[in-house]
Amino acid sequence: MHATRKTGEMPAHWPQYGLAAVIALVISAGLHLVSCGKTSGGVPQPTPAQPQPGATPPNAVLTFHNDNARSGQNLTETTLTPGNVKASSFGKLFVIATDGKVDAQPLYLPNVNTPSHGTHNILYVASEHGTVYGLDADTGSTLWKISTLLSGEKPSDDRNCSQVTPEIGVTATPVIDPAAGPHGTIYVAAMSKDGAGNYHQRLHALDVTTGAEQFGGPKEVQASFPGQGAGSSGGTVVFSPGQYEERAGLLLVDGIVYTAWTSHCDHGPYTGWVIGYDQNTLAQVSVLNVTPNGSEGAIWMAGCGPAADASGNIYLLDANGVFDSSLDARGFPGKGDFGNAFLKISTANKQLAVADYFEMFNQAAENGSDQDLGSGGALVLPDFNDSTGKARHLAVGAGKDGNIYVVDRDALGGFNPNSNNIYQQVSGALSGSVFSMPAYFNNTLYYGAVSDRIKAFAISQARLATAPSSRTSHSFPYPGATPSISANGTSSAILWAAENDDPAVLHAYDATNLATELYNSSQAPDSRDELSEGNKFIVPTVVNGKVYVGTINGVGVFGLLK
């Protein structure tokens, strides 16, 4: 991903729950299994049953795009329905001001018992000024806020790069484990600059009730890896904090917080890093470099978090970079360089290792023309039975070439110089590049590419339809849209999408027919619901009857009007 090209850029604290709440907890964790009722190939099809950090309270949003599969669906929304989401009854309730841009997706915990303010539903918001807020999600009042900056520090400057500007503090969506520490913990990656001009990347672990640092944090991000690639010395590649940014959302799997790193406008030298930290000690437990003997291969993914399956394998798309087309006996790049690839990364024994990969057959041409996969995010699909009755374990991703790539998680496809040996490729399905990721709901995949209409692709017998079943009438400018889904089980499904414009626009569509727009924030008279300017990678958070939308100076809160 180069300057304007390779970037992902364009030119005792939880109450005791009764039986009903336990059922809701199971639903919110994604454990629907065969209860959804819709079938494919004669077999009931599940919504994703993905591991969630800790014990997930009902109506919680703990991680980017709702779960580790990155499905983007909240299936416990009982307040907002296609019948009441309309300009006459739904709109902007208030705006929460922040001290910087809000690029990270807001997260949400219900019924949090705080030591000083009683019990609240709390919205967690992080700004590019390096501030993390614990806010009353229903009123917007500040319960606590902390700065991730140490004494004498300020947020990082933009590193002569217009991607995140004018300052860089917290870009990546944090992750919450409500069972970690005495009251629950939110993990935050933040960048800063000290008085001597040195740059710092740190992992913070904050108490969800007070914002206090936990586990001896923050932890300075430092790493090295064997290799002779860009920026190496003496056979070792070293992580230089000023060269990198944590844009991808954090991922929590089996007690390890994973970070994945990108560059600033492709200012070299840089390579592709994934680094894991013990969630209870912040000790670094594993490091992987995906281009250790080459260069580039950064992990942008438009702010999307790496996905994970139920076995803890991580799936991500990395950007333009060196790929070794001379393969070893396993069919892997001989020097371990996986630029511009769809990667499956094992976390067995809490150690990171590339377990499988898919590389486009024309990777050299795609790399040279900046048509890499790394601009978009990966999504782990639930299991589907194919036409023979065989269970298929699939993941999906798309990048700048407008194709949708569906991979078999048991055999991604590797590299063949003559053709793409993958499970399914839907060519030309999208009318623009993807700087976002899809959402999944009820056997349907929703994609919003650049300057394209959001499209719904049905999944039947473990195959993705080659043409959309419905699409929005409105096209979304750069960077397109990462949709979110709210539903009550399989009913009352709404697709939400934020349009990056000035002002930003929140859209709501009937998820069963995207031609039906239920609402947008430009419809009400007298600019009643108008937002401020949008950010590139806004992802609406929809939970407990409200929709939270980040902007350049705060969070817009939408809900039913009184």
Residue ranges and their predicted role:
Residues 57-346, 352-384, 392-414, 435-457, ...:
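Mobile, glycine-rich extracellular loop/lid and propeptide segments
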Residues 418-430, 468-472:
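Inter-blade linker and blade-boundary elements of WD-repeat/beta-propeller domains
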Residues 20-32:
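Bacterial N-terminal signal peptides
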